[in-house]
Each structure stands twice: as structure tokens, then as C-alpha cells.
Amino acid sequence: FKIISFLSTIFLGFFIISTTIYSIYMGFGPMSRKLKDPFEEHEN
């Protein structure tokens, strides 16, 4: 049981870190130029 819990902890940590890196990449990476900024569009 110790090996299974050890591997699941590593897998969960890797999953959280990869999701965070992916969200930062989607927010600030090359795809961010296609995203529209709602504050820039709303000018009076």
C-alpha cells in the first residue's frame, strides 16, 4: 500500500503542476494574442 500511495501522490502533484503550467501557457503564450480583452473593447 505504501508504493501505491507514493505513486498516486507523485501523479497528483505532476497533474496539478502540469495543469498550472498549461493554464499559464494558454494565458500568456502565443495563443493569448487571439484572446480579446473585454476592458480594451469597452471604451466610452
Curated annotation (Swiss-Prot):
<comment type="similarity">
    <text>Belongs to the PsbN family.</text>
</comment>
<protein>
    <recommendedName>
        <fullName>Putative protein PsbN</fullName>
    </recommendedName>
</protein>
<dbReference type="Pfam" id="PF02468">
    <property type="entry name" value="PsbN"/>
</dbReference>
<dbReference type="GO" id="GO:0015979">
    <property type="term" value="P:photosynthesis"/>
</dbReference>
<keyword id="KW-1133">Transmembrane helix</keyword>
<feature type="transmembrane region" description="Helical">
    <location>
        <begin position="3"/>
        <end position="23"/>
    </location>
</feature>
<keyword id="KW-0934">Plastid</keyword>
<comment type="function">
    <text>May play a role in photosystem I and II biogenesis.</text>
</comment>
<keyword id="KW-0793">Thylakoid</keyword>
<keyword id="KW-0150">Chloroplast</keyword>
<dbReference type="GO" id="GO:0009535">
    <property type="term" value="C:chloroplast thylakoid membrane"/>
</dbReference>
<keyword id="KW-0812">Transmembrane</keyword>
<dbReference type="InterPro" id="IPR003398">
    <property type="entry name" value="PSII_PsbN"/>
</dbReference>
<keyword id="KW-0472">Membrane</keyword>
